[in-house]
Structures are given as C-alpha cells and as structure tokens.
Amino acid sequence: MDLFQLTAHQLHQLLTKKEISALDITEAVYNRIEQVEDKVKSYLTLTREQAEIKARQVDQKIAAGESIGPLAGIPIAIKDNMCTQGIRTTCASKILYNFVPPYSATSVEKVYTADMVMVGKTNMDEFAMGSSTENSGFHLTHNPWDLDRVPGGSSGGSAAAVAAGEAIISLGSDTGGSIRQPAALCGVVGMKPTYGSVSRYGLVAYASSLDQIGPFTRDVTDMAHVLNVICGHDPMDSTSANLKQTDYTQFLTNDIKGMKIGVPREYMADGIDPQVREKIKAAIQKLTELGAHVEETSMPHTDYAMPAYYLIATAEASSNLARYDGVRYGLRVEEARDLVDMFMRSRSQGFGDEVKRRIMLGTYSLSAGYYDAYYLKALKVRTLIKQDFDRAFEKYDALLSPTSPTTAFKIGEMVNDPIQMYLQDVCTIPVNLAGIPAISLPCGLANNLPVGLQLMGKAFDEGTLLRIAYTLEQNTEYTRLRPEI
C-alpha cells in the first residue's frame, strides 16, 4: 500500500524500524497532493519547504539514535482558522486574504513540539460558518468519495485531505458539528473534545463558548495519539481546564462488555435518511453482540437545540467579528469617503453572504428590545439541554446517534436554502451547547457514500468514547475503506 494511505501508527512502526524516512512520508503525501489536489481542492496554502525541513530534522534525530514520539514525522494539515506564525491564515475569507499572524495557536505549537510535519492550511467555510465548505471565499472543496458532492463543513478541507491521502492527520474546529459532520461525510474519524480540554488560544473565534479544536484521523488509535499531543491546560486560554494529563491510548482495550449505551429517540426521528438509519441500526447490533447493553432513551429538549444554537452562536459571532473593520489588519477598501464609509465598504466587500447573514441575526438578537426574548431565552434553553445530558449520563456510559441525517449531498443542492443546510447539524449541535465530547466514526457505506456514527460522552470522558469506538472499529472494516479518486 502507498505510504499516503497508511495510518500514523503504521508509519511510526516503519520509521522506527528505519524501513522508511520521515522525508519519504512527506514526499509521498506531496506527490499525492500533486495527483489529486486539482480534483479535491482541500488546501488554501501549502508549506512544502517548511515541511521538508521538519522531516529532515526528524530523520536526523532517528539517525542520531534519539527516541522519537509516536507522531514524529507524520504529515498534518491545519484548518485555516488556526494562527500559524509567518504563514497566511485567512479563515477562507476575503477580509483576511493577506493576514500573516505574528504567532502560532497553542495547538499548532504542540503539533510542532511533537515533531509533526505541517503540510499546509486547509479550506473551510468562511469563519467556520457552514456545513458544506461552499461558503469559502476562495474555492469549493470536493468530497473524495464523489467529486460532485460536498465534503461537509465547516472543516471540509481538513476532512477531505485525510480521506484523499493528502494528509495523514488534520486539525479542525467544531462549533456546531464542524469536525464530526465532515468526518462522517468523508469516511474518517473526527472528534470534538470536551470544551476546555484543548486550548483555543490562536483559534480565530466564531462563537467563543462553543468553539473547540479537534482532530481528523484514519482510525481511533491515531485519534488517541493526537489527543495526547493537543489536550492539556494552557494559561493563555482563560477557558482552558486545568486537568492532569491523560494517556488516551490506555482506553484502546477492545472490550465493552457490560457498558450501557443510550440511543435518544429524538436523534433517530423522521429527518434521518432511511439508509443512514439502517447503518446505525447495524452498528447498534454489532455493539450488542460485543457485549454492550444498548437501549432507547429520550432527550426531551433536543428540538430546541437548533434555534438556541443559532441565537447564541450568531450573537457571539456578531461580537467577535466586529474586529474586522479594515483598520488593523486584513482587507481595507481605499476609495472610501470617510472612516465610517471605510468600515462599511471593507466589511460588505470582505465578508461573504453567510457571514453577513449570521452577523445580522446575532446583532438583531442582542439588540435592546429583543435581548430577553431571544438571547436570554436561548441561554436558558442551553441549560435545559445540558440537564438532559446530565440525566442521561447518570444511567449511560455513552449516547449514540447518527452524526449527520444524510450522506454527502450534491454541490449546490442546498446553497439557496439556509434552513435545510442548518438542519445538517441537527444531531451535532446539542453536544456543543452542553460542552461535552463526541466522536464520529465510519459505520458503512450507503450508495458508496460514507455514513457516520456519533458517540457522545460525559465531560472530560473522552476515554470511554475511544474505548467504544476502538472496539467497534476493531470488529468491522469501516475505517479501512478508502475512496478511489
């Protein structure tokens, strides 16, 4: 098999045996990019020169007999809303087309420290607002399983890169499903860790109480290794949880006997595609055969998650995005009459339609006459949704649902129907409102398109999710499936 198709732990074994070099892996990934990038379009910026320098440094360590970490020399792609010092960071927006950060995000620094090789910055929905990567200010990204379909979003470039062999691992961000939904649509593993477990320092903010950085990987073992690298307290992030470091590989036991898993009936309702439902039921059957006790449960406030999310997230976005004014960095329209006109023109030309729509929604819900009726009420609903999860986890080790109600849809199919697009995240949004961890892993193909299964867990209990996901993966073939491009 080609090097670009292997997992990080398989490549690590070959590296430590000196059967391949880190530079071999990097070259294999860039050769793959040359083959398929014109079709998939995962990237906004490639960093080949820096990548080759880093790969050679890893090879020098190996030659000197130094021990290397499990992810040393492994190519990783970074979503373009994480600051990378000296490397353009655009958030896929025209308003940041020329922004080069003077510092790197903590997660990026941790990746560098682990001797991973950054391949480039991936495409996304502008400012992480969207579910298809069609809202990018630069170009569309295509699903490697069917180039006429979307990869999901907002981290569509990161998911597509891993699925297409253009990176071994990638980082994305998840505000309402932006890691898990594209992971499901592209047939890879994606995780949104607990809010506060991974530093947000250097992540360009969309909705600060919901945003969370997380990985895309080929399998669950790689996921555990990446979490070992990126999780942990960061004094630069005031919302970072001060927890002791966990070795997540200890949870890869292939044993779920006696575990209790709940399936909320609200997540299996009418909007779920029948083929998706069929694959989820097959996975439930497999988990039962492996010794888990799986039963239906109820999360009564689920229906209110979507409206609450689109009030809270847009309110926070309207505040966060006020900083893009043409004065300090990014796009500045020169032919303005005065300062106010420059603000208006820079923002109206720099932001895309979806970003403008969400800024207007958020500004409206925060305005004096509507604050109590909308924003405050949404915060109360958020509390009710969190209480639903708290009650469920008194009884269950984890909850299970589809990740996305459908498989990947055609490019352009939902562009003119924002409500239909928003409903793509109906199964993922409640997790962000509650701040808990969730993982999406492949559970089969429907019409040769991947279907994703979501596991949701207690806050800071990523280990249980990895344990269940690893057991399911070890007893099925789904994470070993690769698209033909």
Curated annotation (Swiss-Prot):
Q: What class of enzyme is it?
A: ligase
Q: Which PROSITE patterns match?
A: AMIDASES (PS00571)
Residue numbers annotated as active site: K79, S154, S178
**Taxonomy, superkingdom:** Bacteria
Its GO CC terms? glutamyl-tRNA(Gln) amidotransferase complex
Which Gene3D superfamilies does this entry report, sorted A to Z? Answer: Amidase signature (AS) domain (3.90.1300.10)
Q: Which GO terms describe its biological process?
A: translation
InterPro entries xref list: Amidase (IPR000120), Amidase_CS (IPR020556), Amidase_dom (IPR023631), AS_sf (IPR036928), GatA (IPR004412)
Keyword Ligase: yes or no?
A: yes
The text of the family note is: Belongs to the amidase family. GatA subfamily.
Question: What's this chain's function?
Answer: Allows the formation of correctly charged Gln-tRNA(Gln) through the transamidation of misacylated Glu-tRNA(Gln) in organisms which lack glutaminyl-tRNA synthetase. The reaction takes place in the presence of glutamine and ATP through an activated gamma-phospho-Glu-tRNA(Gln).
UniProt cross-references to NCBIfam families, sorted A to Z: gatA
| Name used for this protein in its record | Glutamyl-tRNA(Gln) amidotransferase subunit A
Q: Which organism is it from?
A: Desulforamulus reducens (strain ATCC BAA-1160 / DSM 100696 / MI-1)
